[in-house]
């Protein structure tokens, strides 16, 4: 379903964009699809060499690539004001991460789109990633349990965002700011 949506949605988009994926494998698959469909796309994730990540990032900044397909490893420190769309191919781990990544679009003040594709199975995938990440942490069993409990709550919060019937911007602002001024 997501692949079909992407194939029909992408031709309608102008300019460059970022597609966020949950895993390195998913990043590779989506990037390969885009290139096969004729879109100049690059990839960015922790499994690539620093040299390849830098080369792909530079190509994206210079508009040599229309789309950057990436995990959340891409984003911090990236200042490309003319990003016209951000698409989350899967559910992000939390509202803060989503808000940060969505904020990559339209920094030049021109219209931009942010789309989040969500299926219930995304929750299970993200829970598995959280559990794996927790296992890798070097801390006490008690600290791991606390970390995982908090991570699960953040995941429930982003799931709640997906089902919100109200203003999504307001939801994000209320969630990320103790006292939003203009919602």
Q: Residue locations for each model-derived region?
A:
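Single conserved hydrophobic/aromatic residue that forms the stacking wall/gate
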Residues: 175-183
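Functionally engaged cysteine thiol sites
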Residues: 166-168
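A conserved SF2-helicase RecA2
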Residues: 122-164
